[in-house]
């Protein structure tokens, strides 16, 4: 009985130590995580924004075939479900390649 009481007190002490919330963990609540648009736009200069948009356009134009197939499959719910089980390549072959052969 005495060992059970000692074990309970020890467990309560461990829980209290692990659940203790220090002052450092409260710092994130003090600062507002949202900033206004004017301050948000100061992070990137217009030149950097233009470069980022240009790079994104290049990436969109030069996507590999498997990425295009995956995007087509993501837009069709049945294909997406089939892909979760058998993979995107098998799902694309089942739902889109057969249609092209039939036409």
Swiss-Prot record:
<protein>
    <recommendedName>
        <fullName>Matrix Gla protein</fullName>
    </recommendedName>
</protein>
<feature type="modified residue" description="4-carboxyglutamate">
    <location>
        <position position="56"/>
    </location>
</feature>
<dbReference type="InterPro" id="IPR000294">
    <property type="entry name" value="GLA_domain"/>
</dbReference>
<dbReference type="GO" id="GO:0030500">
    <property type="term" value="P:regulation of bone mineralization"/>
</dbReference>
<feature type="modified residue" description="4-carboxyglutamate">
    <location>
        <position position="60"/>
    </location>
</feature>
<feature type="modified residue" description="4-carboxyglutamate">
    <location>
        <position position="71"/>
    </location>
</feature>
<keyword id="KW-0221">Differentiation</keyword>
<comment type="similarity">
    <text>Belongs to the osteocalcin/matrix Gla protein family.</text>
</comment>
<dbReference type="InterPro" id="IPR035972">
    <property type="entry name" value="GLA-like_dom_SF"/>
</dbReference>
<feature type="domain" description="Gla">
    <location>
        <begin position="51"/>
        <end position="97"/>
    </location>
</feature>
<feature type="signal peptide">
    <location>
        <begin position="1"/>
        <end position="19"/>
    </location>
</feature>
<keyword id="KW-1015">Disulfide bond</keyword>
<dbReference type="GO" id="GO:0001503">
    <property type="term" value="P:ossification"/>
</dbReference>
<feature type="modified residue" description="Phosphoserine">
    <location>
        <position position="22"/>
    </location>
</feature>
<dbReference type="InterPro" id="IPR027118">
    <property type="entry name" value="MGP"/>
</dbReference>
<feature type="modified residue" description="Phosphoserine">
    <location>
        <position position="28"/>
    </location>
</feature>
<keyword id="KW-0597">Phosphoprotein</keyword>
<feature type="disulfide bond">
    <location>
        <begin position="73"/>
        <end position="79"/>
    </location>
</feature>
<dbReference type="GO" id="GO:0005576">
    <property type="term" value="C:extracellular region"/>
</dbReference>
<keyword id="KW-0892">Osteogenesis</keyword>
<keyword id="KW-0891">Chondrogenesis</keyword>
<dbReference type="InterPro" id="IPR002384">
    <property type="entry name" value="Osteocalcin/MGP"/>
</dbReference>
<dbReference type="GO" id="GO:0030154">
    <property type="term" value="P:cell differentiation"/>
</dbReference>
<feature type="modified residue" description="4-carboxyglutamate">
    <location>
        <position position="67"/>
    </location>
</feature>
<comment type="function">
    <text>Associates with the organic matrix of bone and cartilage. Thought to act as an inhibitor of bone formation.</text>
</comment>
<keyword id="KW-0732">Signal</keyword>
<feature type="modified residue" description="4-carboxyglutamate">
    <location>
        <position position="21"/>
    </location>
</feature>
<keyword id="KW-0964">Secreted</keyword>
<keyword id="KW-0217">Developmental protein</keyword>
<dbReference type="GO" id="GO:0031012">
    <property type="term" value="C:extracellular matrix"/>
</dbReference>
<dbReference type="GO" id="GO:0051216">
    <property type="term" value="P:cartilage development"/>
</dbReference>
<keyword id="KW-0301">Gamma-carboxyglutamic acid</keyword>
<feature type="modified residue" description="Phosphoserine">
    <location>
        <position position="25"/>
    </location>
</feature>
<dbReference type="GO" id="GO:0005509">
    <property type="term" value="F:calcium ion binding"/>
</dbReference>
